[in-house]
């Protein structure tokens, strides 16, 4: 694909960007380079590659653990707690 002034102007309009005249040739070169990379990717032969779409994530067994004193230990570290909650200064009036 050839990057010409008409295509660059269309891309400017679609992206709502303005490319200064002194940068247009540089941008055209960069876009041509990017399109070259994309064409190389499309040219790759991928039909022999194995897809990994059927992989599943191994899950661990859920093992509930009873830790009744954890909340009490955490709240005991704070000076201000009430009814099993932290008490913090009011910030919204």
Curated annotation (Swiss-Prot):
Record bears the keyword GTP-binding: no
Keywords: ATP-binding, Ligase, Nucleotide-binding, Protein biosynthesis
Gene Ontology BP term (one): translation
One term of GO molecular function: glutaminyl-tRNA synthase (glutamine-hydrolyzing) activity
E.C. number: 6.3.5.-
NCBIfam families named in the record: gatC
The protein's assembly and partners: Heterotrimer of A, B and C subunits.
Role summary: Allows the formation of correctly charged Asn-tRNA(Asn) or Gln-tRNA(Gln) through the transamidation of misacylated Asp-tRNA(Asn) or Glu-tRNA(Gln) in organisms which lack either or both of asparaginyl-tRNA or glutaminyl-tRNA synthetases. The reaction takes place in the presence of glutamine and ATP through an activated phospho-Asp-tRNA(Asn) or phospho-Glu-tRNA(Gln).
Family statement: Belongs to the GatC family.
Protein's name according to its UniProt entry: Aspartyl/glutamyl-tRNA(Asn/Gln) amidotransferase subunit C
Organism of provenance: Helicobacter pylori (strain HPAG1)
């Amino acid at each position: 694909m050839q990057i010409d002034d008409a295509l660059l102007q269309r891309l400017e309009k679609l992206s709502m960007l303005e490319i200064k005249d002194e940068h247009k040739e540089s941008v055209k070169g960069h876009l041509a380079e990017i399109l070259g990379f994309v064409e190389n990717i499309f040219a790759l032969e991928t039909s022999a590659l194995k897809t990994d779409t059927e992989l599943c994530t191994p899950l661990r067994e859920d093992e509930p653990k009873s830790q009744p004193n954890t909340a009490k230990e955490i709240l005991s570290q704070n000076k201000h707690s009430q009814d099993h909650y932290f008490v913090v200064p009011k910030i919204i009036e």
